[in-house]
């Protein structure tokens, strides 16, 4: 099941990036027929919203859950995943839900229309729209079941001596992230259910009106909630970098606390602008948007402190994990900038005139593609992190190592694509390009339309590079694993790993371990004797 999630998740990411490229090309021509003529704002919005739902629900979450489904039982010394039949059912429900949702969107359904002249004046089909709502709910419910299976494994199947403080950082990050998902996604499903119930009425009054459906759902892609889907990036890097350095992770508890703090700062179910229009000015929202940068910096500092005390060996997974961390750091910095207007407004009480221009400019950033830039950096960082995990754990998952040179090339390609695609959105956000746009009236506040058009072309080129980066990974998996051209020597532990998954065969036998492991520290293969789990 884990392998299937990974396989289809990569293709889901390619679908999302293709749709994003189409949107960026459309935005490259403001106020006239674009390079790609969508024909109506409804068709544009269908493509725009599907690019977001597919990147999160068809790519990032299944990749993370797939990696965890396979690895978490091995990392915690469990004989199998908890509720394996439920996990299998969840995967097939997820896949069927995706197929239904994509078909309904292309059949003039989708998750609403922001500016309709009437309920279905732009050609939306009510039955297809209803099925779009139900199918995406089915997808998210399936992902929740998969998450529950992973968390149940961590909680109930740890071996003797392994407390939560001895969990490998990837398993710990999945426990933290999964807990946030379980708290937040049911609220999102409730928003979806309210929209669906009202939509079924003869005359949708508010929640089911097509112009309001997306507004009730969009908080999942916004700060702070979006960071909950990148928490495992920290865990993956935390497992890879100490092994690549050949030393144990220093200040292990602080690393765990940093991951936990990021989880606490990424719970965003309260930040729903549809129900709370003033949320962007509230102290909690602003504080979370700024403070999320702190645990990321602390975690990266811990990894840097560990790596300089060892001897880093070059590998594709090392490069990819560093790129993923840097992308997440940029996302957190952009988020802090995005929400800083109200924070500076509080300082204005000291002097009520000299900060006026700055505050007005920072407030203007709200509602622009700056929010899209944050989302894109976070989700692509998650994709890069999972790819790093694939190159690190591929001997354990598939029995073959992936090609190191192809992995390094994919890291460079993904980094270049993110710089062009995400960076152009940051610049266009500063230039006041609005989000969720189609017609020229939405660009009335843009400083320089020619510059916005130019950077949208740059963003489309970046999208092509991102697509090529994922394509390289798929190609490497095909050649190394499916065609069995990869190196299978020393597949049990080619890197000198520190955690339990490297103590069994690759791929693991039925039951995972020949005997139940006994653990007394967080690095059981590095310190197999009872030497304590204290920080060094």
How does the language model describe each region?
Residues 1-536:
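Membrane-embedded and interfacial regions of multi-pass energy-transducing membrane proteins
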């Amino acid at each position: 099941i884990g392998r299937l999630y990974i396989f289809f998740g990569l293709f889901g990411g390619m679908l999302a990036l293709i749709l994003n490229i189409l949107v960026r090309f459309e935005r490259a021509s403001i106020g006239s027929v674009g390079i790609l003529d969508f024909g109506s704002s409804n068709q544009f919005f269908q493509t725009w919203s599907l690019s977001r739902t597919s990147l999160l629900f068809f790519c990032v979450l299944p990749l993370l859950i797939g990696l965890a489904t396979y690895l978490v039982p091995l990392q915690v010394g469990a004989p199998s995943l908890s509720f394996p039949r439920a996990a299998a059912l969840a995967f097939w429900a997820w896949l069927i839900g995706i197929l239904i949702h994509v078909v309904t969107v292309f059949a003039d359904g989708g998750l609403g229309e922001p500016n309709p002249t009437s309920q279905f004046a732009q050609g939306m089909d009510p039955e297809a729209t209803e099925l779009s709502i139900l199918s995406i709910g089915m997808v998210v419910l399936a992902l929740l079941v998969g998450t529950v299976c992973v968390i149940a494994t961590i909680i109930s199947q740890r071996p003797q001596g392994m407390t939560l403080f001895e969990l490998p950082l990837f398993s710990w990050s999945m426990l933290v992230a999964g807990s946030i998902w379980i708290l937040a996604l049911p609220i999102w499903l409730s928003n979806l259910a309210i929209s669906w119930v009202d939509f079924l009425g003869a005359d949708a009054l508010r929640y089911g009106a097509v112009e309001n459906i997306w507004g009730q759902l969009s908080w999942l892609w916004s700060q702070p909630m979006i960071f909950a889907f990148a928490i495992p990036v920290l865990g993956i890097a935390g497992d890879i970098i100490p092994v690549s350095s050949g030393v144990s992770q220093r200040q292990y508890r602080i690393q765990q606390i940093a991951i936990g703090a990021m989880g606490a700062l990424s719970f965003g179910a309260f930040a729903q602008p549809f129900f709370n229009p003033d949320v962007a000015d509230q102290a909690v929202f602003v504080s979370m948007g700024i403070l999320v940068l702190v645990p990321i910096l602390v975690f990266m500092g811990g990894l840097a402190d560990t790596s300089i005390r060892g001897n880093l060996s070059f590998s594709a997974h090392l490069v990819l994990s560093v790129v993923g961390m840097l992308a997440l750091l940029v996302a957190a910095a952009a988020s802090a900038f995005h929400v800083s207007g109200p924070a500076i407004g509080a300082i204005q009480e000291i002097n009520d005139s000299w900060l006026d221009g700055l505050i007005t400019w920072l407030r203007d950033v709200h509602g622009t593609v700056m929010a899209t830039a944050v989302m894109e950096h976070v989700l692509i960082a998650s994709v890069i992190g999972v790819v790093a995990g694939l190159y690190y754990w591929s001997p354990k998952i598939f029995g073959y190592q992936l090609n190191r040179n192809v992995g390094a090339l994919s890291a460079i390609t993904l980094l270049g694509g993110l710089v062009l695609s995400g960076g152009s959105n940051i610049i266009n956000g500063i230039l006041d390009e609005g989000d969720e746009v189609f017609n020229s009236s939405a660009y009335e506040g843009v400083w320089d339309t020619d510059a916005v058009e130019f950077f949208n072309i740059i963003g489309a080129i970046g999208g092509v590079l991102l697509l090529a980066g994922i394509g390289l990974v798929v190609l490497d998996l095909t050649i190394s694993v499916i065609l069995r051209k990869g190196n299978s020597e020393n597949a049990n532990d080619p890197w000198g790993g520190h955690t339990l998954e490297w103590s069994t065969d690759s791929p693991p036998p039925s039951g995972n371990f020949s005997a139940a492991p006994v653990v007394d520290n967080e690095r059981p293969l590095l310190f197999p004797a009872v030497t304590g789990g204290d920080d060094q």
